[in-house]
């Protein structure tokens, strides 16, 4: 009887600790694994699955005095730290001319070709491939704006198409000459309804093909990706993929942004990507994702999440952040062999200084372009950057803390292969 009672008491304790969902769910909520982080193994994951990050702001951050550290608390090249954490791919955005006539940068990393080459060389030196993300704009290109570069503003369409082809080819030639291991090229960024100032899909398709041609002629082994967003909108991706097919656009990868607080369910993401892959024989991936680990603002510039009205399906904790990344990887893997990878957006865009030092932060953002936009960008983007220029809106979604130390969630990239064991 005593033995039976003892077993009953232990059972009550276990259920009280983990609830009826079991230790896996409890660990997923609290991170009770040996590593301090619980990551469930991703089923069906390809051995060559892309575990990527976009660290486009890194040069500007380092120029602003930001340092990064390894697990032991010693300063270390962030690219080495990323590689050690299981990252195998780096994405970098490329703007044609993100400067005003006096050479003042628009911010957001001031990501021109020179910056891309610096980042690409460091990625290659640490054994990671590069995804070159051409925006074909002088600043941010997204569904709300796809402004042509200043130098192309007065070109007719045929000349613009030629300029896009030549710019792509010359840029890739320079990157290859620098010894960069380019694995993929993105022809446009979140091009839901525009590209380089064009909004007609017949013309957009010709521009896509001009960029694709430049890639094919540079290196036939480089994958060509097209990038879209808002997978939660019913029928959007089916319509885009059919339109690309109808206009005979040459590409390999249909890429999607997926931010959990904006873009619907993971089930839907898998469904719409599977439909594109199965119908048109394309590879698919997530080119951008991220998640919050804290609600704190690190630099005095407001963050994009969390906010009222957003759907946050995981806790705003380091463990919740790891859950979110792991689940996006699973969603893409669930597509099957066509699901090739996931990129985390700006995991190192941490504060250049604490929030209470806002005025000093502003000076660094303006000088080095280490915030999302400078006041100089107003001439090119008056309605957005001109009004809301400032610092990092995603410092609370980084995979490093505000002082540059790696969070446990950074290791989700290596843990998805095996999972993490529980603490004893």
From Swiss-Prot:
InterPro entries: Glyco_hydro_53, Glycoside_hydrolase_SF
Gene Ontology molecular-function annotations: arabinogalactan endo-1,4-beta-galactosidase activity; glucosidase activity; metal ion binding
Binding site for substrate: 142-145, 229-230, 263, 292, 307, 384
Entry keyword set: Calcium, Glycosidase, Hydrolase, Metal-binding, Signal
GO process terms (BP): pectin catabolic process
Annotated Ca(2+) binding sites: 297, 299, 301, 303, 392, 395
A Pfam family this chain is assigned to: Glyco_hydro_53
Reactions catalysed according to its record: The enzyme specifically hydrolyzes (1->4)-beta-D-galactosidic linkages in type I arabinogalactans
The keyword Metal-binding belongs to this UniProt entry's keyword annotation: yes
Enzyme class (EC, first level): hydrolase
Cofactor notes: Binds 1 Ca(2+) ion per subunit.
EC number: 3.2.1.-, 3.2.1.89
Active site: 190 (proton donor), 288 (nucleophile)
Span of the signal peptide: 1-26
Keyword Metal-binding tagged: yes
Domain of life: Bacteria
Cofactor(s) demanded: Ca(2+)
Role, per record: Involved in galactan degradation. Degrades arabinose-free galactan to galactooligosaccharides, producing galactotetraose as the main product along with galactotriose, galactobiose, and galactose. May hydrolyze the beta-1,4-galactan linkages of the galactan portion of arabinogalactan type I, a pectic plant polysaccharide from which most of the arabinose has been removed.
Family of the protein in this entry: Belongs to the glycosyl hydrolase 53 family.
Official protein name in the record: Endo-beta-1,4-galactanase
Organism: Bacillus licheniformis (strain ATCC 14580 / DSM 13 / JCM 2505 / CCUG 7422 / NBRC 12200 / NCIMB 9375 / NCTC 10341 / NRRL NRS-1264 / Gibson 46)
């Amino acid at each position: 009887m005593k033995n039976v009672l003892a077993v009953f008491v232990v059972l009550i304790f276990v259920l009280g600790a983990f609830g009826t969902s079991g230790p896996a769910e409890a660990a997923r909520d609290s991170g009770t694994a040996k590593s301090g982080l619980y990551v469930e193994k991703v089923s069906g994951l390809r051995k060559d699955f892309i575990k990527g990050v976009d660290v486009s702001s890194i040069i500007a951050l380092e120029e602003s005095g930001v340092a990064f550290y390894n697990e032991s608390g010693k300063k270390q090249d962030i690219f080495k730290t990323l590689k050690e954490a299981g990252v195998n791919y780096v994405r970098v955005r490329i703007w044609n001319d993100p400067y005003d006539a006096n050479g003042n940068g628009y911010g957001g990393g001031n990501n021109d070709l020179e910056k891309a080459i610096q980042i690409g060389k460091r990625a290659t030196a640490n054994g990671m491939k590069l995804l070159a993300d051409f925006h074909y704009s002088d600043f941010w290109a997204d569904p709300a704006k796809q402004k042509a570069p200043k130098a192309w503003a007065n070109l007719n369409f045929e000349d613009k198409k030629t300029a896009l082809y030549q710019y792509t080819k010359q840029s890739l030639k320079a990157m290859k000459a620098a010894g960069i291991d380019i694995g993929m090229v993105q022809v446009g960024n979140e091009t839901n309804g525009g590209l380089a100032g064009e909004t007609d899909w017949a013309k957009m398709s010709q521009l896509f093909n001009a960029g694709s041609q430049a890639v094919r002629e540079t290196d036939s082994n480089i994958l060509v990706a097209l990038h879209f967003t808002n997978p939660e909108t019913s029928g959007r991706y089916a319509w885009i993929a059919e339109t690309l097919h109808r206009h005979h656009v040459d590409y390999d990868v249909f890429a999607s942004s997926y931010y959990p607080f904006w873009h619907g369910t993971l089930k839907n993401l898998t469904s719409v990507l599977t439909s594109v892959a199965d119908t048109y024989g394309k590879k698919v991936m997530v080119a951008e994702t991220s998640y919050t680990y804290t609600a704190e603002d690190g630099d005095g510039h407001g963050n994009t999440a969390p906010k009222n009205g957003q759907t946050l399906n995981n806790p705003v904790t380091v463990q919740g952040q790891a859950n979110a990344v792991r689940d996006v990887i699973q969603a893409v893997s669930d597509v099957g062999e066509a699901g090739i990878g996931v990129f985390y957006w700006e995991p190192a865009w941490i504060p250049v200084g604490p929030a209470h030092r806002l005025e000093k932060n502003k000076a660094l953002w303006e000088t080095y372009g280490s915030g999302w936009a400078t006041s100089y960008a107003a001439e090119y983007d008056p309605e957005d950057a001109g009004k809301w220029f400032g610092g990092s809106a995603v410092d609370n979604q980084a995979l490093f803390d505000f002082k540059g130390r790696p969070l446990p969630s950074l290791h989700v990239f290596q843990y998805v292969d095996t999972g993490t064991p529980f603490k004893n």
